[in-house]
Amino acid sequence: MKALIIYHSKTGHTRAAADDIARGLDEKGVEVTIEEAAKADPAKASDYDILLVGSPTYAQTRYKAAAKPVERFMDAMKPDALSGHLAGGFSVCAASGAEKIVAAIEKKLASLGAKVVSPGPAVRAGAPLSLWQGPDAGAADVEKCKEFGRRLATEA
């Protein structure tokens, strides 16, 4: 079984969440590929059994959309590209709004035909406005991400 994790990260916190989810998948024997959204090929997403999409939470989007590279990746996918595939979303924020970004990602993945495992993790890390990197995710959030990976592997 193979999983693809697509993410965008300005300060490294969303990448860290992707790595934590990957560890949970790996524990269950899933082969994981992690790619930056801006460099990933949306046409190849259907080559994987599981697709995970992660984005930081930016206040300027009013918590309605993922980061632009993530949105562009999902928008470039063909309708029903994920039919028969398992998918999930995750987001990282310094303050609030991550749950809404996760829900927006999940809605888009479902519109592409995926069976969405919900809710994906909303991780607390970083600093408001990304003026500095801020603190890393706490142990509870790291475990939440790993558990989400294990859950996806079990449901696949």
Mark where each language-model region is:
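Extreme N-terminal starter segment of soluble prokaryotic enzymes
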Residues: 1-4
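Short polar catalytic/cofactor-binding loops
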Residues: 8-12
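FMN-binding flavodoxin-like domain, especially the glycine-rich phosphate-binding loop
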Residues: 13-16, 20-35, 47-156
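Short acidic loop-to-helix transition motifs that present clustered carboxylates
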Residues: 36-40
